[in-house]
Regions:
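Catalytic or ion-coupling anion/metal-binding cores of large enzyme and transporter domains
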Residues: 1-197
Length: 197
């Protein structure tokens, strides 16, 4: 727009400054939003935490709750290897397809799985994710921004929709809060079906 003469330098800077709420937050379904969503989908983040924009007060609240929960997890001996099982990774692959996640997701999740000794490869992504419908209408492929994703219900709403459709392969996997993914999300639905279908 600037190169075409449609806006001046000040207009360009205003557009850039308003395109994202702050540092530390990806307002599209890039690698950061994808991996936050998949960390929650794997069960390693508290429910509802992945899509909270960085400057929101909720981000500070969930950070505090996460710190408290980590202490409890130590006392409960709830280790990452008990949460990030093969079944949890299969769920994450399905969630990635539903959110329209970044093409970097297989590289990252396969690497995390390998580190944990969980067998996961690119064939799994094709087998598990190929028939899952795209539920999230988020830029760059869609219309909406990350804040809209959060307001529409974020990852719990996506998982709730997948559960309702019978598309989440392992609803009984354990998550960081000590509950199953189904217990956390079975009643969650999108509050804006333009953003999360």
């Amino acid at each position: 727009m600037q190169a075409a003469g449609e806006i001046d330098d000040d207009g360009f800077m205003d557009m850039v400054a308003s395109s994202t709420p702050s540092v530390g937050y990806c307002n599209s379904m890039g690698t950061a939003t994808t991996m936050n969503s998949l960390a929650e989908g794997l069960g390693m983040q508290l429910p509802g935490s992945a899509a909270i924009p960085a400057p929101y007060r909720e981000r500070g609240q969930i950070s505090y709750e996460t710190g408290l929960r980590i202490v409890d997890m130590v006392h409960e001996d709830l280790r990452p290897d008990r949460i990030m099982t093969r079944e949890a990774f299969e769920n994450a692959i399905v969630i990635n397809s539903a959110i329209g996640g970044s093409t970097n997701a297989p590289i990252h999740l396969n690497g995390i799985a390998k580190h944990l000794g969980v067998a996961l490869n690119n064939d799994d992504w094709q087998k598990l994710g190929h028939k899952v419908p795209l539920l999230v209408n988020l830029q760059p492929a869609g219309e909406y921004l990350g804040e809209d994703y959060h307001r529409a219900g974020g990852v719990p709403a996506v998982i709730g929709e997948l559960l309702a459709a019978g598309l989440l392969p392992h609803p009984d996997v354990l998550t960081a809060n000590g509950k199953t993914i189904a217990e956390n999300c079975q009643d969650c639905r999108s509050t804006n079906t333009d953003v999360i279908k």
